[in-house]
């Protein structure tokens, strides 16, 4: 029986090899690599049971990437469906409890049938010679490298010993890579911390400079505002002085003391000083206001009050008095004492 099986599988392999030159292998077109993995896993469990190493449920490239990132060994199993030793290897070796324990605890396990496009693609990369085929892959010298190949039927104890030997022989590379990676990470963290400290210092300096600029701008605006207020006050005083001079120039001549229609008025100013002047009965009270306004001692804004009876004289036009009355109409006598009330701050 054994010679017949050997002859059968040998002829089958020769036929498949020759067929490659006649037409392209349909397995070379990978369209659903994850589907290939899941399909193989289901067929494996249907044939050999659910007690097996944990399959990596992803593409070969993803398995390589994860093993590289996690710094773990990656065990690749390529299953030859038609090979005479595949069934015995899967049942007796790959699914042995001690083998399962070793694989699950110390490595990632990726497997696929070479009849699947994804498995066939990987077999073209690893170039196995026979089945069962196992390849141990790890990060070595910063690239994923095959560090061990197991081909042909193997017993559980030998499988464990050889896998352990391969891992022990190459463990130093992983340790070295871990140390280098930790050093790179520490360097990166240190650089990041330095960058963050630099950025924090830069932001603090920028904030200080911003506050300085704002303070300079605030002072500049304040000085400009003070200067504008000063100029405005100077213009106001100049305008006021010019207005006083105009009022003074427009005042009618003071009547003589002998004029029977003249009125002698004594003004008591807010600073307790007194001013005396004569006016004509026929003149408007506005003349009195203009006279007082032209005086240097007078406040800028004021009203004129009579004492008997106590009242405010309508010396400037208003809604009630559009045309202020004359001195006579206001009821003033030949001699009067009037009080100047300061209204500047009101």
Swiss-Prot record:
One of its GO terms (biological process) is proteasome-mediated ubiquitin-dependent protein catabolic process. Residues 258-340 form the UBX domain. It comes from the Eukaryota. Keywords: Acetylation, Coiled coil, Cytoplasm, Endoplasmic reticulum, Lipid droplet, Unfolded protein response. InterPro entries: FAF1_2-like_UAS, Thioredoxin-like_sf, UAS, Ubiquitin-like_domsf, UBX_dom, UBX_domain-protein. Residues 176-251 form a coiled coil. The keyword NAD does not apply. The modification N6-acetyllysine is found at residue 68. Residues 204-249 have a biased composition (Basic and acidic residues). Its main location: cytoplasm. Residues 200-262 are annotated as: Disordered. One of its GO terms (cellular component) is VCP-NPL4-UFD1 AAA ATPase complex. It is found in: Cytoplasm; Lipid droplet; Endoplasmic reticulum. Identified in a complex that contains SEL1L, OS9, FAF2/UBXD8, UBE2J1/UBC6E and AUP1. Interacts with YOD1. Interacts (via N-terminus) with UBQLN2 (via C-terminus). Interacts with PNPLA2 and UBAC2. Interacts with ZFAND2B; probably through VCP. Interacts with LMBR1L. Plays an important role in endoplasmic reticulum-associated degradation (ERAD) that mediates ubiquitin-dependent degradation of misfolded endoplasmic reticulum proteins. By controlling the steady-state expression of the IGF1R receptor, indirectly regulates the insulin-like growth factor receptor signaling pathway. Involved in inhibition of lipid droplet degradation by binding to phospholipase PNPL2 and inhibiting its activity by promoting dissociation of PNPL2 from its endogenous activator, ABHD5 which inhibits the rate of triacylglycerol hydrolysis. This is FAS-associated factor 2. It comes from Rattus norvegicus (Rat). The gene is Faf2.
């Amino acid at each position: 029986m054994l010679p017949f099986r050997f002859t059968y599988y040998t002829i089958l392999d020769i036929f498949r090899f020759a067929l490659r030159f006649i037409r392209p292998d349909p397995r070379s077109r990978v369209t659903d690599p994850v589907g290939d993995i899941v399909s193989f896993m289901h067929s494996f469990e249907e044939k050999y049971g659910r007690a097996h190493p944990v399959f990596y449920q992803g593409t070969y490239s993803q398995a390589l990437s994860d093993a590289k990132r996690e710094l773990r060994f990656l065990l690749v199993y390529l299953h030859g469906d038609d090979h005479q030793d595949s069934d015995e290897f899967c049942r007796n070796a790959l699914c042995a409890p001690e083998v399962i324990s070793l694989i699950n605890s110390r490595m990632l396990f990726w497997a696929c049938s070479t009849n699947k496009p994804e498995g066939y693609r990987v077999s073209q990369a690893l170039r196995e010679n026979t089945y069962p085929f196992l390849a141990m892959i790890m990060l070595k010298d910063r690239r994923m490298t095959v560090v061990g190949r197991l081909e042909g039927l193997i017993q559980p104890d030998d499988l464990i010993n050889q896998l352990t030997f391969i891992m022990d022989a190459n463990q130093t590379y992983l340790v070295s890579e871990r140390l280098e990676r930790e050093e790179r990470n520490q360097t990166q963290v240190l650089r990041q911390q330095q960058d963050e400290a630099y950025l924090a210092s830069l932001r603090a300096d920028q904030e200080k400079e911003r506050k300085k600029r704002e303070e300079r701008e605030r002072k500049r605006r304040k000085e400009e505002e003070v200067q504008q207020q000063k100029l405005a006050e100077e213009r106001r005083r100049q305008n006021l002085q010019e207005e006083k001079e105009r009022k003074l120039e427009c005042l009618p001549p003071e009547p003589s003391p002998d004029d029977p229609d003249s009125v002698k008025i004594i003004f008591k100013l807010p600073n307790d000083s007194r001013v005396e002047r004569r006016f004509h009965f026929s003149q408007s009270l506005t003349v009195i206001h203009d006279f007082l306004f032209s005086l240097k001692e007078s406040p800028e804004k004021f009203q004129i009050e009579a004492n008997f009876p106590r009242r405010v004289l309508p010396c400037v036009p208003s809604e009630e008095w559009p045309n202020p009355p004359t001195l006579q109409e206001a009821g003033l006598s030949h001699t009067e004492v009037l009080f100047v009330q300061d209204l500047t701050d009101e």
